[in-house]
Amino acid sequence: MKKLSIIYDVTALCPWNCAICCIGATSDKSCRNNELTQEQKLNVAHQVRELQENGYEVRMDLSGGELFTDIPAHTELLTALSEVLGRTKLGVSCSGYGIDSKLANFLGSTVHDVEMTMDVVPHHPYKLRPAAYSVAAAKAVALLKEAGCEVGLQTVASTYNSSYADALAVFAWACANGVDNWSILRFFPSGRGADYPEAAMTDAQCEAYVHMVQEMVDSLPVGHKPEVDFHYLMPGHKKYTNICRCVRHSIGILPNGDVVACFWALDSSTGAVDPKFLLGNVKDNSLLEILNGEKARYWFDCEHCCELGSGSTPERSVA
């Protein structure tokens, strides 16, 4: 079986308008004009089934934009994908927006995990996110835990939130609120984040941050601690590697159906930074056809380090 992680950003609609949004999501509803129709979205589930029938073991994460700006459509899509993949192979990344007890209970029975971003603790000002962004995640955590969901928090580490005080505050909040997993991702200037190159940490800064967090986690005397996972492109821990994962390990699907080899290889207008990263579109070809195509073959055939380099842009992994 060939393992494949797929991140499907279903919509570009989002209430937050974050300064660093990697796909350029917006609260302007006209962004949905280029989005797949519901029928086309549901067809992605059929395409995933075809991958499974042809030797792929697929793990999928649905994200956005904000997935729950359209709860009826996207719960229908999650149901279809859960039936194809099984609950244990399906996850959701969201902000916490729109989650009430009914939606939390649905997610508890349909997906394996729900991950939300918390770069700083609620009510703490942060240059790169709106004021209420962490508050939405915090409110959703309690509802999701009550519904039996596995709950994760993701912190995107940048030069603006990499202090000991910021890291300790988020970790302590996660401990106190029963969060299961704390995932730490390196900030890359992808999408709108390309306008903030100064927010990207160097390899040396990342390594120092990793060691700081590891020591903090080991020494904090609390009863419950979430599992801590560092993204593989953060130097300083045993999982670190800069070997390219494009196509052989993961792909991304954008709201308009474009399939990209490297999810983070997006410019400030959220188009592929180079044509070779654009593999096809699910409206024109199935995922299996795209992965068997010539554009994908380039990535299967090459063995190299991340082309976008250090201070560059890797693909987001859901592994």
What residue spans do the PLM features occupy?
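Radical SAM/AdoMet-radical enzyme domain recognition
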Residues: 38-62, 70-186
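Canonical Radical SAM [4Fe-4S] cluster-binding loop centered on the CxxxCxxC motif
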Residues: 1-40, 262-264
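The −1 position to Zn-ligating cysteines in a subset of zinc-ribbon hairpins
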Residues: 13, 17, 243, 301
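A short acidic, helix-capping loop that chelates divalent metal ions and anchors anionic groups
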Residues: 28-31, 122-128, 191-196
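Flexible mid-to-C-terminal extensions adjoining Fe-S/redox cofactors in radical SAM and related proteins
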Residues: 1-4, 24, 28-29, 258-259, ...
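A C-terminal junction/extension of Radical SAM enzymes
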Residues: 187-265, 319
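Residue-level recognition of short loop/turn positions
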Residues: 17, 95, 254-256
